[in-house]
UniProtKB/Swiss-Prot annotation:
Keyword Methyltransferase carried by entry: no
Family, similarity comment: Belongs to the CobB/CobQ family. CobQ subfamily.
Disulfide cysteine pairs (residue numbers): none
Organism placement in taxonomy: Bacteria, Bacillati, Bacillota, Clostridia, Eubacteriales
Alphabetical list of SUPFAM superfamilies matching this protein: Class I glutamine amidotransferase-like (SSF52317), P-loop containing nucleoside triphosphate hydrolases (SSF52540)
GN (gene name): cobQ
Domain GATase cobBQ-type: 246-435
Keywords per UniProt: Cobalamin biosynthesis, Glutamine amidotransferase
Protein name from the UniProt record: Cobyric acid synthase
Amino acid sequence: MSRIMIQGTASSVGKSILVAALCRIFKQDGFSVCPYKSQNMSLNSYITLDGKEMGRAQVLQAYAAGLEPEVYMNPILLKPTTDKSCQVIVKGEVYGVSSAKNYYNMKKEFAPMLKEDFEELEDKFDIVVIEGAGSPAEINLRENDIVNMGLAELVDAPVVLVGDIDKGGVFASLFGTVMLLEENERKRIKGTIINKFRGDVEILKPGLSMLEERINIPCFGVVPYFNLSLEDEDGAVYFNTKVNSKIDVAVIKLPHISNFTDIDALKIEEDVSLRYITSSENFGTPDLLIIPGSKNTIGDLLYIRKNGIENKIKQYAEKNGLIFGICGGYQMLGRLIEDPFKVETELGEINGMGLLDIRTVFAEKKVTTRVQGSVIDKQIPVYGYEIHMGISSYGEKAKPFIKIENKVGIDDGAVNEGGNIMGTYIHGIFDGANFREYIINFLRDKKGIERKKSVVYEDVRNGEIDRLADIVRNSLDMNSIYSVMGIEGKK
């Protein structure tokens, strides 16, 4: 088995998307390929077919490789709960909650497991494309490292270092990163990539030549800046308002927003414009208001209560505005949230917004499962996955929203008596073309706009991955990349 590792000078330089590109390129060239990231920190996660939890970046990379996502692609997932602690998920299951300091000391315990699991990939794939995290030059974290150079040494992987020129200072960041590494670590870096370049590459060439001379490492290529309709795990997606859009969908930007990839599929609707609500001042009058998931539901509810957004939501509801809550957002819409086991806070309970007649109790065990069903009385197919620690029960004024077909006798979500406020535990619900079409056509009808068929999100995503692969293939010296892996080229 051959392997290659993509490391970066910082977070958000494009490691994840370049790994996805390479996975698709290698697949196109006839190789069986697998993505791998030993440790991922993200509030965006995914549930596999067997009910295990993993990071979303490796899900996209798995699709690029033509694989069903599985937890061996991301054996450790860290989900921040506060600024100083996180939930540790190992091989798809909750390991515990740890402070940053305790986890730093805990990492070395995982190294043997990571090595053993990685070795199992040798018999399954021709190539493994490994993604690092942050920067290998975070020298304060070098001891017990299991995700950058520590992992590269553990599995003996050659490294390609990526820098983001769009932020400025790319030559300094590449040079500084290399210089801060130990000599044996520098030798692992076989090439560099400059990502997100705008303009004429000829202008860069003097700088590239000087950098290559200074660090004695070749540049494998310059990748241009481009926009794709693909999810971004590293930070909440940024929305560009569409000039001719007629439907305004607004999303509450919670401090601990999780699984914001839930709304990605709405971006592909031509007449839909998405925006974030960050304060009561920019609430506006949206056609649809989405309250997304949260890793700290109670904390985020207190946040929107304090800054006036909750009052705006209630005023919007009184005017028959359409509100859709997902997971934590669904819980916030209810009457009461109870936390008897102190899962999120020392508060025993907190009143919700009271817009849905439900009561939620946080449990100690997390629910992680794939689901499929249909909107009750509508026969609109729904699919997605659940990740939550709360169990919600109905009051007299709420009725179930979705009938779950793969869990007998179980209903999901709730709808108010007026039908304008609804919530669900199902992440990825808008990925399904049928459900997305149902919601957006409801808004179109309300505004007197012609109905449209929704495109299949998976088809759009696959086409965008192909486009990504074409851009990256044409930008990089693929012969050199194959060479550092000990491969002559296409099969």
